[in-house]
Curated annotation (Swiss-Prot):
Similarity field: Belongs to the KdsB family.
Keywords annotated in UniProt: Cytoplasm, Lipopolysaccharide biosynthesis, Nucleotidyltransferase, Transferase
Protein name (Swiss-Prot/TrEMBL): 3-deoxy-manno-octulosonate cytidylyltransferase
Coiled-coil region: none
Encoding gene, per UniProt annotation: kdsB
Length: 254
């Protein structure tokens, strides 16, 4: 195994439009916009050559400027955060063998340690894409919005699904389910290849863009972690995050 430590770049996609929470990245959480927490956690991982916000909104860009957070303006036409990350990466002239980390702008609780774990496999030059998983309960596995993943003996993803996989024939409720955490890292040349591939059949069935990689024989190394997060898609999610951040801040101030 050839080992070379690459350069890492963190890009946080932050679009203004959201069907359920318009202007989501700007939502105030204890005096700061949501994206500020994501940026701080990324910086605290201490792995990145640079961390930037990729946005389609002048309002988000102005807020980032006021907080001294670097940003890259991107198109309003992007269908996915990955496409937005790619445009920003191109504008940043990121080298082909460097690693681009897509850090979701609606994950204010993402742990620096989780980001560190995400990129650890890239010391192996054969690794092209990584993502995270964590153990979940059988009840959680039944929820379609909780994406599941099954992996091979070497840790590569075999499949991602909204269905409960693997199917437990003997109804073992304590079975081994892995929930997917939507944090990704790509070598730049693999990200370039990915965004230029047409959407795949399974991707369209499941509405999971990572299946495009698997259907085109691009392996995804899955790193299991105990550092779980909480995305913000609904008002209820926001209330949970506010409470958890309040607990963190209280713990730090003690």
């Amino acid at each position: 195994m050839s080992q070379i430590s690459p350069l890492y770049y963190g890009i946080i996609p932050a679009r203004y439009g959201s069907s359920r929470l318009p202007g989501k990245p700007l939502i105030d959480i204890w005096g700061k916009p949501m994206f500020w927490y994501v940026y701080q956690n990324a910086v605290e991982s201490n792995i990145f050559r640079s961390v930037v916000l990729a946005t389609d909104s002048e309002e988000i860009a102005e807020s980032a400027h006021q907080l001294s957070i670097p940003y890259v303006m991107t198109s309003v036409e992007h269908i996915s955060g990955t496409d937005r990350v790619y445009e920003a990466a191109i504008k940043m002239n990121i080298e082909p063998d460097s690693v681009v980390v897509n850090i979701q702008g609606d994950e204010p609780l993402v742990k620096p340690e989780a980001i560190q774990q995400l990129v650890e496999p890239f010391i192996d030059v054969s690794i092209q894409v990584t993502t995270l998983s964590t153990r979940i309960t059988a009840n959680q596995a039944m929820l379609p919005h909780q994406v599941k993943v099954v992996v091979s003996s070497n840790g590569d993803a075999l499949y991602f699904s909204r269905a409960a996989i693997p199917y437990l024939r003997d109804n073992d409720t304590d079975g081994y389910y892995l929930g997917h955490i939507g944090l990704y890292a790509f070598r730049m040349h693999t990200l370039d290849k990915f965004v230029h591939l047409p959407p795949s059949q399974l991707e369209q069935f499941e509405k999971l863009e990572q299946l495009r990689l698997l259907e085109n024989n691009i392996p995804i190394r899955v790193v299991n972690t105990n550092h779980t997060s909480q995305g913000v898609d609904t008002v209820e999610d926001l209330e949970i995050v506010q409470g958890l951040l309040a607990q963190r801040m209280e713990a730090v101030s003690r």
